[in-house]
Amino acid sequence: MKVAIIAPTYLPSLRANTIQVMKMSQAFVAANNEVRLAVPEESTKEPATDRSWESLAEQYGLRERFPIEWIPASSAGKKYDYAWRAVTWAGKWQAEIIYTRLPQAAALATFRDHKTILEIHDYPQGRMGPILFRAFLKGRGAKVLVVISSALASDLQKDFGSPEIQLPLIIIPDGVDLDRYKDIPEPRTARLELINGTAWLNGENKASFQVERFTAGYTGHIYPGRGVSLIIEIARYLPGMNFLIVGGNPADVERYRSIVAKSQLDNVFLTGFIPNSELPRIQAACDVLLMPYQKRVSASSGGDISRYLSPMKLFEYLACGRAICSSDLPVFREVLSSETAILLPPDDAPAWVETLKDLSDHPSEWKKFADNAKKTAGNYSWENRVRKMLTALA
């Protein structure tokens, strides 16, 4: 089947949604579809210095190759001009399915009677969000609506329900590339590899990073609400543990490095951005992986996404086979349970400190959680997401 994927954001980018689009493109290819990906390109900006497949595959951890079309998009057009061009491009290619997270493209594609799958991760925003969403639902080509959490599905059904939502609505959380987590080393071995074979820890960081220490890790963006301040607070009370914080935009990383330096903490390490291809072996260096999301969580756009979260790190953590300490947010209980993670109050630092002490003192406890997490991860591959979408389409 010919599948045109219309991405909502620029490429390459540090945003999580570009990782998701690239992983989904790869998964559609793995399911024996002919895939082409459209991404916006601002005409007023110089192209990225390296958009070669080799560079993109390294940044996003890809194995399957697929063509990418950069389509002009003006900042004044607010993605409407891009949506028009991208849907036209898909039509000329005679795509059998259009899959997108861009509401403008979904509304136009269904109006033109293209079979369309729309995936959304948040409630339709602003004045135009609900209008575009309803336009998609009413279009002749609307075939499947994908949402990432039951909470989001419930709110959509309440506000846009029958008779508007008449197409299949399926709940599919985000996913993970399971193959990349096969045969990862045990934590101490991974830490040795981290010290000896990577540039992400260097200079003073490398000198103070102690391989034998119990290590807690966080990977992903460090926007407000992700809990990095809580991690730093916890680290003050656990000087005998390593705290590894991986990812983030340069400005955010420098801000937190400054806080760590002023606090004179030598057990907190911020690596900054690393390519997705490197992520499994760095996560493997941790004995426990942290998701200290707060009650209000910012996305790259600045909006609050705490009600509908389905972060990719959750599924990566499961696949890594490590203990997970997570904030006890209702949306996380759609995936996690007391068998797969330790769920903690997001604003109770002493509870996090005591839990990490307990895990460090009783390795058999974290091994139990890790084994259960690894088993659970098998349900959340990118390929499974694609299969569910195509099944709903049939």
Question: Where are these predicted regions, by residue range?
Answer:
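N-terminal strand-loop element at the rim of the active site
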Residues: 7-15, 26-81, 152-153, 157, ...
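Conserved donor-binding/catalytic core segment of Leloir-type glycosyltransferases
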Residues: 4-6, 146, 193, 197-205, ...
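A short, well-ordered alpha-helix in the C-terminal region of glycosyltransferases
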Residues: 358, 365-379
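Conserved acidic donor-binding segment of nucleotide-sugar-dependent glycosyltransferases
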Residues: 311, 338, 342-349, 358-363
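Carbohydrate-associated surface elements
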Residues: 151, 175
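Nucleotide-activated donor-binding/catalytic signature segment of Leloir-type glycosyltransferases, i.e.
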Residues: 206, 213, 254-283, 288, ...
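Glycosyltransferase donor-sugar binding loop
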Residues: 41-43, 219, 242-257, 272
